Design a protein with these regions (language model features):
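Bacterial Sec-pathway N-terminal export signals of envelope proteins
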Residues: 103-138, 193-194, 219-222, 321-323
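Transmembrane beta-barrel architecture of outer-membrane proteins
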Residues: 17, 62, 154, 183-185, ...
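Gram-negative outer-membrane assembly/targeting C-terminal domains
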Residues: 297-323
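Small/polar, glycine/serine/threonine/aspartate-rich low-complexity segments that form flexible
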Residues: 102-113, 145-146, 158-203, 316-323
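Metallo-beta-lactamase
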Residues: 77, 128, 291
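Periplasmic alpha-helical coiled-coil/stalk elements that build and connect Gram-negative outer-membrane
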Residues: 10-122, 235, 239, 280-282
Length: 323
């Protein structure tokens, strides 16, 4: 059952990761296209200003270079989306799967309130990998006891029942029937092995070595699971903080872009200032979208690390998706 649970949890995380990878790629492509459109508008503006003599050729060249870069980014983003969709189709066993997006103004999950040590303790008790390694250690210990039993005395119970024919018909003290005499007997036999060769000794050494290996494997799995739990925990906490930071950065980047556009229109700023502000805004939007998806997957990875992930944990995520 531990192997089944581990496989089920791994499947849940892999499918969820593939699902949100597609959404990340879709957002990335849309934002690249939006940035390309904005750069194109800025390029057209720079050309007009150059033609009337209010801007230099440098502004046109800067905008053209940024527009050409946007073309390359669009091609890469489109290809990445195709690959991510193929990966999702493979994970779910369907063709042309259409994942739903997150609803607008979606509030993500809350940060875990428990201390990381509580999650680590839970992982050591519930993780399928830890339980499987512990079972392997217990079996190895039983094999050692079984091998050691070859050096120990054994007690056997023997029961016999003999019959003989009474030819002269004289009376006997044993059970008799007609001319036959039946003699039951019982005995307890103690066997003390003095020396049974080196087979038993070598078998004991082998099982002890296997037990040591099983114990080492168990400790390694336990430490690895604890480390994975801490990594998932701190990753989730940091991810939630990143989302808030990116939301603030998005608002600031939008304000900076608006200010640079206004400055450019009155001749205070140059074209490259607007282009840089556009690039920063759309990069922040992409980072924010990815951070939101990473938080949702990170929550599943934390539960997987502790061994408590079930299909029911997907329901809160489904509730965040647009209808």
């Amino acid at each position: 059952t531990a192997q089944y649970e581990a496989a089920e949890q791994d499947l849940l995380v892999r499918v969820s990761q593939a699902y949100f990878d597609v959404l990340t790629s879709e957002d990335n492509l849309e934002l690249v296209q939006a940035q390309k459109k904005a750069v194109g508008e800025q390029l057209a503006s720079a050309k007009r200003n150059f033609e009337v003599g209010t801007a230099t050729i440098t502004g046109v060249r800067d905008a053209q270079a940024r527009f050409d870069l946007s073309n390359a980014q669009e091609i890469a983003a489109d290809n990445d989306l195709r690959i991510k969709r193929l990966a999702l189709d493979l994970a779910v066993g369907l063709s042309n799967a259409k994942p739903k997006r997150l609803a607008n103004n979606t509030k993500l999950i809350d940060a875990p309130t428990e201390d990381v040590s509580i999650w680590v303790t839970q992982s050591e008790a519930a993780s399928p990998a830890v339980r499987q390694a512990q079972l392997g250690l217990e079996i190895a210990s039983l094999e050692v006891n079984k091998a050691n039993a070859g050096h120990k005395p054994t007690i056997d119970a023997q029961l016999s029942y003999a019959g003989a024919r009474n030819l002269n018909g004289t009376a006997t003290t044993a059970l008799s029937s007609s001319n036959h005499v039946f003699s039951p007997s019982a005995a307890v036999v103690l066997n003390v092995p003095l020396f049974a060769g080196f087979t038993t000794m070598y078998r004991v050494k082998e099982t002890v070595a296997l037990e040591d290996k099983a114990r080492s494997d168990y400790e390694n799995v336990r430490r690895t699971t604890a480390q994975a739990t801490r990594t998932a925990y701190f990753g989730l906490v940091a991810g939630l903080s990143q989302v808030k930071a990116y939301e603030a950065a998005e608002a600031s980047s939008q304000s900076a872009l608006d200010a640079n556009k206004l400055g450019y229109s009155v001749g205070v700023n140059i074209n490259i200032d607007v282009l840089n502000s556009q690039s920063q805004l759309y990069q922040t939007k992409r980072d924010l979208a990815k951070a939101r998806y990473d938080v949702l997957v990170g929550n599943l990875k934390l539960r997987q690390a502790t061994g408590t992930l079930t299909p029911a944990d997907l329901q809160p995520i489904n509730a965040l998706l647009a209808p």
